[in-house]
Amino acid sequence: MGIQKPAWLDALYAEKFFVGCPYHETAKKNERNVCCLDCCTSLCPHCVPSHRFHRLLQVRRYVYHDVVRLEDLQKLIDCSNVQAYTINSAKVVFIKKRPQNRQFKGAGNYCTSCDRSLQEPYIHCSLGCKVDFVMKRYRDITPFLKPCHTLTLGPDYIIPQDLLTDDEVAAYETPRSTVVDGDESMSWSSASSDNNNAGAAAAYAATTTHVVRKKRTGFCLCAKSANSYKEVSEDPDDISACINRRKGVPQRSPLC
């Protein structure tokens, strides 16, 4: 009999995200958008400080569906052959299957679980579809799991500062790894040394310009219009006139 799925995987699939936190109903920004893999529950930003030593996975929203960053998810489970999408230069993967209103058969690959049209060489449209495929075919998800003892939130995640101490604020402000764009070859990792698990993994493998914006001021425009820095007037009255210079009164076009 195959080993059951890990508890955090079931929680990631079953928990409801982007709903109000019942423990912080009156607080602002209380949407649950983090999954604690150790407690197997969803968290809001106000809950995060009490779980700061646990493995935390941020859940994002894309076209009204829950997604997770591919860089974070592949630390937990093999995500090869799962189609990823790009949001703000970060690759994300859908957590659950997405319903389709109509079936469209054309050229290309199709999802192994829901028949959704995919780009080559992908054969799964979501994490849930791959897990279902593996469980039905191999009865064991263990060969696809990866050992992950620490998982922190990204630097773009905002935690209410009034809930943190000075030491915690400094800890959360330390640099973390950034998103690496691009697909990398996935290595098989197994939590068990059983030969059957290695065989299942092998069988599956065979199947399948930084821009800086500056505020424009009247003085800068005046200096820029001069041919050289020597031509810029040093008279305070001229400088004041340049800074306070405004367009004339707008003229309305005559009515025909």
Swiss-Prot record:
Induction: Induced by RGF1 peptides. A zinc finger (B box-type) spans 21-59. InterPro entries: PLATZ. Coiled coil: none annotated. Expressed predominantly in root meristematic zones. Disulfide bonds: none annotated. Probable transcription factor that plays a central role in mediating RGF1 hormone peptide signaling leading to the production of reactive oxygen species (ROS) in roots to modulate meristem size and root growth, probably via oxidative post-translational modification of the transcription factor PLETHORA (e.g. PLT1 and PLT2). This is Protein RGF1 INDUCIBLE TRANSCRIPTION FACTOR 1. It comes from Arabidopsis thaliana.
